[in-house]
Amino acid sequence: MANTTFSGPVISKNGFITTGPGATKTINSTGLGTAGLPLTVNAHAGRILISQDADGIYTLPSINANANSAVAGSTDYNNPNNLGATFMFYIDILATDVQIQTDGIDKFTGAAMIAVDDGAKKAFFPAAANDVLSMNGTTTGGIVGSVIQITALESAQYLVHNTLILGSGSISTPFSDT
């Protein structure tokens, strides 16, 4: 099916439901080196990204908050503004060294909850300079079933939300700087 672009508001009285083979996408960065897998809005946003890589590196696209063309402005369907693009990750293989990172300019805000099987849980908030979310399969989470949701919020800020990372042991923050 082709892409359809609307320049005005779209109203649905009963919601939109994404289903079918395009609703999920299996990802891994095997063989891609330290740069990892570069995610794009067209190929990865709005889908459940099933991570099948124990030591994957996934790089979020640079946030483009203002990309109006000189000719058409915000109604140009080729406008690359990506605010609101959401990336949902599902950990399908124990993450021993999985990293979700920004371009280094964009930073994380929001929170991530890490829970362990003894009922302990803790919310972690990224520091102002944090641009990496790492999971090691234990203290920073990454056990199979972990879910991470990240949305381009505004210029230079990705929001980490609706996130439950499963861990073990003495849990610690998954956020760091590059």
Give the label of every model feature segment:
Residues F6-K121, Q157-T178:
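Exposed extracellular interaction/assembly regions and N-terminal maturation sites
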Residues M1-G8, I148:
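Parallel beta-helix/beta-solenoid repeats that form elongated, surface-exposed shafts/blades used
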Residues F124-S146:
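Structured beta-strand segments within beta-sheet-rich domains
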Residues T151-A156:
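Localized edge beta-strand/strand-to-loop motifs within extracellular or lumenal beta-rich domains
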Residues M1, T59-L60, M135-T139:
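Short aromatic-glycine motifs in intrinsically disordered, low-complexity regions
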Residues Y77-N79, T140, I150:
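Generic marker of residues within folded, mature protein domains
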